[in-house]
A protein has these predicted regions:
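Short loop/turn segments immediately following beta-strands, especially the blade-tip
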Residues: 172-179, 275-280
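Short loop/turn segments immediately following the C-termini of beta-strands
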Residues: 26, 67-68, 111-113, 164, ...
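Short, conserved, GDST-rich strand-edge loop motifs in beta-rich repeat architectures
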Residues: 108-124, 252-266
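A short beta-strand motif characteristic of beta-propeller blades
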Residues: 1-5, 38-45, 81-88, 136-142, ...
Length: 289
């Protein structure tokens, strides 16, 4: 395990695109692109907590969540930032994670409470997944307990959502119009609370776990196939590199949700772990080099 870069903020949403790892630095309000030598380019400055993003097909730019605007924004290849979809009619709270499949279906989820203020007392309102397109969005799955990382299988047939508060990965069939059906438990993960996820060519999923400071590879049904233990919280993971056989993990020491807005001494790190089975599906499939 090697550190690609250290000394950043709270990192999330790793994506492999055009030979570089792109990450959202939540505390700095930046999207950064990091090459294999550790050189960093700041791609966008945007204050949002959470802030996650993914890439549209065919060089269509990227789409990012904006919590303050309760919207999805689009960053075009020429650097223009515009509104992609208004999400304010779906919830009084801002969106969380986003994934875009190979057909351009844009799925965005919402934990349905004020993330920056921390979890509410008692049982929070259930979260949901919405399908967004330019100018519109509609809920396609609800009753999700803190929906977090999402991934789509390589055949564009299945969306997998990490339900952090139910300690499971939940799957849906994707219809021709992008709608979701046939909800099912894809994997129970014990007492872990899965955060960011990605998929590999064997059909297994990697998930990051904050509290247990690890990344775990599981197959459908929940069998644990591999585990990478860290010295700090793991927030998300991405299979990248030229052969997609590097597991990139974004990690930092976690001060707890109650201290998120006040913590200043972040030690955000991107770790690189070689693996045998390459990545597949989305995010990340066919994203250039």
């Amino acid at each position: 395990m090697d550190a690609l870069i250290t000394g950043l903020g709270l990192l999330e949403s790793p994506r492999w695109q055009n030979g570089r790892l792109w990450v959202a630095d939540w505390t700095a309000g930046l999207i950064r692109a990091i090459d294999p030598a550790g050189r960093v380019e700041v791609v966008l400055e945007h204050q949002s907590l959470p802030m996650c993003f993914d890439f549209l097909p065919a060089a269509g730019g990227l789409v990012l969540t904006s919590s303050s605007q309760r919207a999805l924004l689009r960053l075009s290849a020429d650097g223009t930032l515009s509104r992609y979809a208004d999400l304010s009619v779906l919830s009084p709270h801002g969106p969380n994670d986003v994934v875009i499949d190979g057909r351009g279906n844009t799925y965005v989820n919402n934990v349905n409470f004020d993330f920056a203020a921390g979890p509410p007392a008692g049982d929070p309102a259930p979260g949901f997944v919405a399908l967004a397109s330019p100018g519109s969005a509609r809920v396609v799955a609800d009753d999700l307990a803190f929906p977090n990382g999402m991934a789509v299988t390589a055949d564009n047939a299945t969306l997998i959502v990490a339900e952090s508060y139910r300690h499971r990965l939940t799957a849906f069939d994707i219809g021709a119009d992008g709608s979701l059906s046939n909800r099912r438990v894809w994997a129970e993960v014990g007492d872990h609370s899965p955060d960011g996820i990605c998929l590999d060519r064997d059909g297994a999923a990697w998930y990051a776990d904050v509290a247990d400071r690890c990344c775990v590879r599981v197959r459908e049904g929940g069998e644990v196939l591999d585990r990478v233990q860290l010295d700090r919280a793991a927030f998300a993971c991405m299979l990248g590199g030229n052969d997609r056989r590097t597991l990139f993990v974004v990690a930092a020491h976690w001060p707890g949700p109650q201290n998120l807005m006040h913590h200043t001494e972040w030690d955000g790190t991107v770790l690189a772990v070689p693996v045998l089975v390459p990545g597949a599906g989305w995010p990340g499939r066919g994203s250039g080099g």
